[in-house]
């Protein structure tokens, strides 16, 4: 049965065989015809049932559910990207199985220029019947011979040819160039191929041929080739539909929905393999006696039932079976049949298309029937056209039901209310049948009204698409190499991180001794962490960014906080120092009035998150402004004195400033109230810094050899002496040069949220210039500084985000991109944030090892209080920091505690501890 189409019409050889019984009367004839054609009528409800059943089978197969076996296979093709129009180069295409008993070789040139197409050169070779049914090696040797014969006629270099292999049979793919044949269809039954990798079989045959050096880059089926050959247009072409000898569809599915891939990101083209759909509940009611006969007489009874109602290999045979039945019943041809009419394969798809085409007229129908050895009358011609229309209309409607299921799956996958998509169509049924596509589109609109579908005829029968798959694979491989080269400096190994740890240990030692060092190692005069006995009401001020907070902190058996946020206008932050501190005092007075504290003199802790050299607990000399502050006449001054002077200017305000604290110390103290082992503070937010409890004997410039003191490392400046030069990239240099403090805070500029987004932006600009991103087109929005905030980095790397959500975030920023672009942007973000976390971890490892050695311990158990938006919000940062510390400081058990309001609560606790210690001293 699968050999239908090989014989064609045999004119002049037939003798008529006529029914000897009396012919039916006109009314009986009409009833017989209606009864026969009625079998091919499919109701809307039946189409909807097929749509729903197929959709259910698709979802079952995507989930990897094996029992009961799904009715469709949903095979991933490992084609993860659709073309974007810039692909170029020369490619060889070998098509096997797309057009029945022939193979085709093409030479395809892609220009990469929109609207400029070069017609492919091609040659078709008929496959002998003995090859189709012989040994597998014989088939692939035949294919390799055809390749060589075609290429011999082309003016081409014999070396380095890239080939795309279109193999249109059900296959299990495990890679773009690895595909195992599941089963033969379409009349092929070559031995020794099922269960084998067809790409390897082709490579072996090419090697045996020995004439050309050909790299088989990709294997796809004709359906994928059809989709990929669709010209990029206004709407994405993400569905391929082929109705040729057989029928199938493919579409771009979210990779996370394809269980067998175990991938979270990106998309993959899935071959539905709907020809094998055979749900008895859905298909049973629409199967006719003719379908059963056709199936029974085929090479594969019971298989490919859906395909046998739609594919071009079978439409002519269905028409033949109906015509033979009506002739035997005496309704057609005066009750006469012919040997041709009773022979399989005598009516081809081309005959059906011609007989139904209104432009050919009755004369062509008459001629075709005469070639079958029949003598049709005028009424016979009209009835034959009705039969052709009934068979083909049903095929188009069934195909539409299946396509509607695919569109519903795609819509659900994208979580879109309405779906706008282009469907690339290919195959001789779509191309040659006069009404197939119009019936198809009308039925799809009926079954999937929420989908706006454009049917786009394929170019070159899918051959160009196979070349496009090959070209896209080559482009992606080249882009992947460029991306890896760009990101390689951000991927730090153990030795590099250990070197950072060692460099920091040296800088710490120098700073503690008072020698020149990029780490200032500033004494904070905080000599103890909380012990839980602290009590009282305290005020806290928190100045470290564009917002300023005033807090009332009540310490009893727990800590209660009341606070208010006040903004600091840019004119104040960059105006005079007096203006800044007067504004701060105004905010404090406003807060006291609102809280009913006017006239009270509560102990006050001042969180001042800028580099200071402390001369006492309540004396801090500002070394330099950071974070965009530039208030004049402050650097080199005691900021507590500046605050007290502003209090004096305000008059009638009494404030007892007990301690000046930076946010890092406040974080350590805040967590220390909950965990006595917390002796390290870490901030990773807009900026970054760390502090820890150092042995007083190691701190030069502070009298005393016993006890401990918290040291403010100011590690953001680590590397300002050039010690991090080996890790600095061209992108770090660009960010540094564009900053307000070039050459300073080099460590901070590789770690903190204020700079990571800028590093990402500079990398994206570089990749765009290489043509890797945005099709090489300069995006104006990408020229804008600081468009990537910490929140953006945290959101885009979230494990819970699908790729479409990553794209949405980027599109909201004004960056139009493809799924491939989105994946690459994601990788860039991951590389930059991973390096930041690892560098931070190397710093923490240096600190904990210093504490362990200070105390002469084999093992140290210590806690780190952490604050900062990057650390808290980023999905991977905290775990990467912890993993790096474990790797570099294996003898330290380090617990990370997230601080709750370290800047406010911590400053109050520093004040509370100072009051407790002062009270003990008085006692």
Curated annotation (Swiss-Prot):
Hexokinase is an allosteric enzyme inhibited by its product D-glucose 6-phosphate. ATP 2 binds at residues 542-547, 686, 753-754, 790-794, 869-873. D-glucose 1 binds at residues 168, 185-186, 221-222, 248, 273, 304-307. Belongs to the hexokinase family. It is an enzyme of class 2 (transferase). GO terms for molecular function: ATP binding; D-glucose binding; fructokinase activity; glucokinase activity; hexokinase activity; mannokinase activity. Residues 1-30 are annotated as: Disordered. Keywords: Allosteric enzyme, ATP-binding, Glycolysis, Kinase, Nucleotide-binding, Repeat, Transferase. D-glucose 6-phosphate 2 binds at residues 542-546, 663, 686, 867-869, 903. This is Hexokinase-3. D-glucose 2 binds at residues 609-610, 626-627, 662-663, 688-689, 714, 748. It comes from Homo sapiens (Human). Residues 84-220 are annotated as: Hexokinase small subdomain 1. The N- and C-terminal halves of this hexokinase contain a hexokinase domain. The catalytic activity is associated with the C-terminus while regulatory function is associated with the N-terminus.
């Amino acid at each position: 049965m699968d050999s239908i189409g090989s014989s064609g019409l045999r004119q002049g050889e037939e003798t008529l065989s006529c029914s000897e019984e009396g012919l039916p009367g006109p009314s009986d004839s009409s009833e017989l015809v209606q009864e026969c054609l009625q079998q091919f009528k499919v109701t809307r409800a039946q189409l909807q049932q097929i749509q729903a059943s197929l959709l259910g089978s698709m979802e079952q197969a995507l989930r990897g559910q094996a029992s009961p076996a799904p009715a469709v296979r949903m095979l991933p093709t490992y084609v993860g990207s659709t073309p974007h129009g810039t692909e170029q180069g020369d490619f060889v295409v070998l098509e096997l199985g797309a057009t029945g008993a022939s193979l085709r070789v093409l030479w395809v040139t892609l220009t990469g220029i929109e609207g400029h197409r070069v017609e492919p050169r091609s040659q078709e070779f008929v496959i002998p019947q003995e090859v189709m049914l012989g040994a597998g090696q014989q088939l692939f040797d035949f294919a390799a011979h055809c390749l060589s014969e075609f290429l011999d006629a082309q003016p081409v270099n014999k070396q380095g040819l890239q080939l795309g292999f279109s193999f249109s049979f059900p296959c299990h793919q495990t890679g773009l160039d690895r595909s195992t044949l599941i089963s033969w269809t379409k009349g092929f039954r070559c031995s020794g191929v099922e269960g084998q990798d067809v790409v390897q079989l082709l490579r072996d045959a090419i090697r045996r041929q020995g004439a050309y050096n050909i790299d088989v880059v990709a294997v796809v089926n004709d359906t994928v080739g059809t989709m990929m050959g669709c010209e990029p247009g206004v709407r994405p072409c993400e569905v391929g539909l082929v109705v040729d000898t057989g029928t199938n569809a493919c579409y771009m599915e979210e990779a996370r929905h394809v269980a067998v891939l175990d991938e979270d990101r990106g998309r993959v083209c899935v071959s539905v393999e709907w020809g094998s759909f055979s749900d008895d509940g859905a298909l049973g009611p629409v199967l006719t006696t003719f379908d059963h006969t056709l199936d029974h007489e085929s090479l594969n009874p019971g298989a490919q039932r859906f395909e046998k109602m739609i594919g071009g290999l079978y439409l002519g045979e269905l028409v033949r079976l109906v015509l033979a039945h009506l002739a035997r019943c005496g309704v057609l041809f005066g009750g006469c049949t012919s040997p041709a009419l009773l022979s399989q394969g005598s009516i081809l798809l081309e005959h059906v298309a011609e007989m139904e085409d209104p432009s050919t007229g009755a004369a062509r129908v008459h001629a075709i029937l005469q070639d079958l050895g029949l003598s049709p009358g005028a009424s016979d011609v009209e009835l034959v056209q009705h039969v052709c229309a009934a068979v083909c209309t049903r095929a188009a409607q069934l195909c539409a039901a299946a396509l509607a299921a695919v569109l519903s799956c795609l819509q659900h996958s994208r979580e879109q209310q309405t779906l706008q998509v282009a469907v690339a169509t290919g195959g001789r049924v779509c191309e040659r049948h006069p009404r197939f596509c119009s019936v198809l589109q009308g039925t799809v609109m009926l079954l999937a009204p929420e989908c706006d579908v454009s049917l786009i005829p394929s170019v070159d029968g899918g051959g160009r698409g196979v070349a496009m798959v090959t070209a896209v694979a080559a482009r992606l491989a080249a882009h992947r190499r460029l991306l890896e080269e760009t990101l390689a400096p951000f991927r730090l190994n153990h030795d590099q991180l250990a070197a950072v740890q060692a460099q920091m240990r040296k800088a710490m030692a120098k700073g503690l001794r008072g020698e020149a060092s990029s780490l200032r190692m500033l004494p904070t005069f905080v000599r103890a962490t909380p012990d839980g006995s602290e009590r009282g009401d305290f005020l806290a001020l928190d100045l470290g960014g564009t917002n300023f907070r005033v807090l009332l902190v009540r310490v009893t058996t727990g800590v209660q906080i009341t606070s208010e946020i006040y903004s600091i206008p840019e004119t104040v932050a960059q105006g005079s120092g007096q203006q800044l501190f007067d504004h701060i005092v105004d905010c404090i007075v406003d807060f006291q009035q609102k809280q009913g504290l006017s006239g009270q003199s509560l102990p006050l802790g001042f969180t001042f998150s800028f580099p200071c050299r402390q001369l006492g607990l309540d004396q801090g000399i500002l070394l330099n402004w950071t974070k965009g502050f530039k208030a004049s006449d402050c650097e080199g001054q005691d900021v507590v004195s500046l605050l007290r002077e502003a209090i004096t200017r305000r008059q009638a305000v009494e404030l007892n400033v007990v301690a000046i604290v930076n946010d890092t110390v406040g974080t350590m103290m805040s967590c220390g109230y909950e965990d006595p082992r917390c002796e390290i503070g870490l901030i990773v937010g807009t900026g970054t810094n760390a502090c820890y409890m150092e042995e007083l004997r190691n701190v030069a410039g502070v009298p005393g050899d016993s006890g401990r003191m918290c040291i403010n490392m100011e590690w953001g400046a680590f590397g300002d002496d050039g010690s991090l030069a080996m890790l600095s990239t061209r992108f770090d240099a660009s960010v540094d040069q564009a900053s307000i403090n070039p050459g300073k805070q080099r460590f901070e500029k590789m770690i903190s949220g204020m700079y990571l987004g800028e590093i990402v932006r500079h990398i994206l600009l570089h990749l765009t210039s290489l043509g890797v991103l945005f099709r090489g087109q300069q995006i104006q929005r990408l020229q804008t500084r600081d468009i990537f905030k910490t929140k953006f980095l945290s959101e885009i790397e979230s494990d819970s985000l699908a790729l479409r959500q990553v794209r949405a975030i980027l599109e909201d920023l004004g960056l139009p991109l493809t799924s491939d672009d989105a994946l690459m942007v994601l990788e860039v973000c991951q590389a930059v944030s991973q390096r930041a976390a690892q560098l931070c971890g190397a710093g923490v490892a240096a600190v904990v090892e210093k504490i362990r050695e200070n105390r002469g311990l084999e093992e140290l158990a210590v806690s780190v209080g952490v604050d900062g938006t990057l650390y808290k919000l980023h999905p991977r940062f905290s775990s990467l920091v912890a993993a790096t510390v474990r790797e570099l400081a294996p003898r330290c058990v380090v617990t990370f505690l997230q601080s709750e309001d370290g800047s406010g609560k911590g400053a109050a606790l520093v004040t509370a501890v100072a009051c407790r210690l002062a009270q003990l001293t008085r006692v």
